[in-house]
Amino acid sequence: MPWRGILAVGGGAAIGAWLRWGLGIMLNPVFPTLPLGTLSANLIGGLLMGFAMEIITRHAVMSPEMQLLATTGFLGGLTTFSTFSAEIVTLLLRREYFWGTIAIASHVIGSLAMTILGILVVRALYAWAAA
C-alpha cells in the first residue's frame, strides 16, 4: 500500500476523531438519553459526504490521496457506527425502546437526508455560479 495513502487516511482520521470527541464532550451532556454529540457527528458527516461526493464527481482533478484524506480518513473518523451501535444497545438494554427507535431513525434517516442535502447544495451552488 502506498505511504501517501496511508498518511492521508491516518491524518484525516485523526482530525475527524478529534472533532467527534470534541462534539461528544460538548453536546452529549445536553441530552444524555439521545447523545447529541454522536448524532451531530453523523449528521455533519453525512452532509460533508454529500459535498465530497458531488465535488469529486465534478472534479476528477482531486488526487486520490486528497479523496482518501477527506472521505475515508476525515469523514470515517468523524462519523461513528460503533458508538451509535453501543448507544442504541444501551437504550434497548434499559428497555427504553421509544428512545432507541428515535435514535435509530435520527441517525439513519438524518444521515441519508443530510447526504442528499449536501449533494443538492453543491449542485445549486454550481448552477448559481454558472448563471
List each model region and its residues.
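Membrane-interface helix-loop junctions in multi-pass transporters/channels
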Residues: M1-A131
